[in-house]
């Protein structure tokens, strides 16, 4: 039986259900690697009717034999990470397989304060940041002024590394944003304490991954957020500060592209977005409320109500292209169960012309009007279906329509939050690379 190293990415604006899909695939993985992002992302896993909400720790932590590595491309809030570890321990989940890259950057208290202050100052130009300090952490990383996990393990080095940044950030907080300064000694002592608790999990990320590759272990790379939030390829400036696309796995984990065998994109059967920015298929009124309520569309990280809309095939095809998707996992199909008809965006109208590509300008994107095709609904429950043939004919037709529109086959269909509410057409890790559910 062949094995594969797989990247799991979000094919929309995040919140697609990657946590469940990664959890499902983690059962077949030897190593699960989170390669970018921080506590601005979140995923929800349901185990034995228990809802576990994680922001930093990969879903694979639920499997004792699986190594879960938080890679160099991530930014770590140690306070949040330790809370997650404590929550897992309280639920009798073994955390010995968790490993943390020594070179991952650390979100400091001043990053969070600056993030909130800068977003507030933007006023009407706000971008919808989560306020968790992710952008300022990545900014310090780019300016070569950041703190890394390895710095938390050495008192002298941390004091030296923080001397300049703390002075600079306190000056910014006080003089520019009117925020009380931080107590430098208190910050240093607090983060040295975090370092002591995290020390048993800290490893050389590159050595860990490549040792696994040499041993022919299969590796699952887990992205956070989604394609349209990518810093370089998303709806800029309404994006995150890292690269959630599949190429980000190479940089954030420290591997070459030849190590990756397949890329699976996760997309909801409709579309959601949190925060600001254009959203051509966004719904208002009763259908929006219905999707939000049935889908439980509230952010894991922010608790904000998500904006809901019809499935957008234009951004879907874009996600296929920029990620090199081999197959799709379609989630929350069951949320559409009660609708008598379902619309799918197949193109946009921009300045009176039909376009089938994603505009690079946010201003142009905001002027796009969706061109829809309408399909019949199935108006019966799908949550109990476990095989493709159990699905209503119109639900199968809808999935085939999406596969044809996206020009990529569907490997997995999710019909609820629980693990068993899933139809696996083919295991992307163990199965042969062939056409799955397609038109």
From Swiss-Prot:
Enzyme Commission code: 6.3.4.4
List of catalytic residues: 15, 43
Catalytic activities: IMP + L-aspartate + GTP = N(6)-(1,2-dicarboxyethyl)-AMP + GDP + phosphate + 2 H(+)
Gene Ontology CC terms: cytoplasm
InterPro entries in alphabetical order: Adenylosuccin_syn_GTP-bd, Adenylosuccin_syn_Lys_AS, Adenylosuccinate_synth_dom1, Adenylosuccinate_synth_dom2, Adenylosuccinate_synth_dom3, Adenylosuccinate_synthetase, P-loop_NTPase
Pfam hit, one: Adenylsucc_synt
Record's cofactor remark: Binds 1 Mg(2+) ion per subunit.
GO molecular function terms listed in the Swiss-Prot or TrEMBL record: adenylosuccinate synthase activity; GTP binding; magnesium ion binding
Subcellular location: Cytoplasm
Binding locations of IMP: 15-18, 40-43, 130, 144, 225, 240, 304
Enzymatic class: ligase
Residues reported to bind substrate: 300-306
Cofactor(s) this protein requires: Mg(2+)
Gene3D superfamilies found in the cross-reference section: Adenylosuccinate Synthetase, subunit A, domain 1 (3.40.440.10), Adenylosuccinate Synthetase, subunit A, domain 2 (1.10.300.10), Adenylosuccinate Synthetase, subunit A, domain 3 (3.90.170.10)
UniProt pathway: Purine metabolism; AMP biosynthesis via de novo pathway; AMP from IMP: step 1/2
Binding residue positions for Mg(2+): 15, 42
Chain sites annotated for binding GTP: 14-20, 42-44, 306, 332-334, 414-416
Keywords for the protein's UniProt record, in alphabetical order: Cytoplasm, GTP-binding, Ligase, Magnesium, Metal-binding, Nucleotide-binding, Purine biosynthesis
One GO term (biological process): IMP metabolic process
The protein's role, per its UniProt record: Plays an important role in the de novo pathway of purine nucleotide biosynthesis. Catalyzes the first committed step in the biosynthesis of AMP from IMP.
PANTHER family: ADENYLOSUCCINATE SYNTHETASE
Family (UniProt): Belongs to the adenylosuccinate synthetase family.
Matching NCBIfam families: PRK01117.1, purA
Subunit field text: Homodimer.
Protein name as it appears in the record: Adenylosuccinate synthetase
Species, as recorded: Prochlorococcus marinus (strain MIT 9303)
Gene that this polypeptide is encoded by: purA
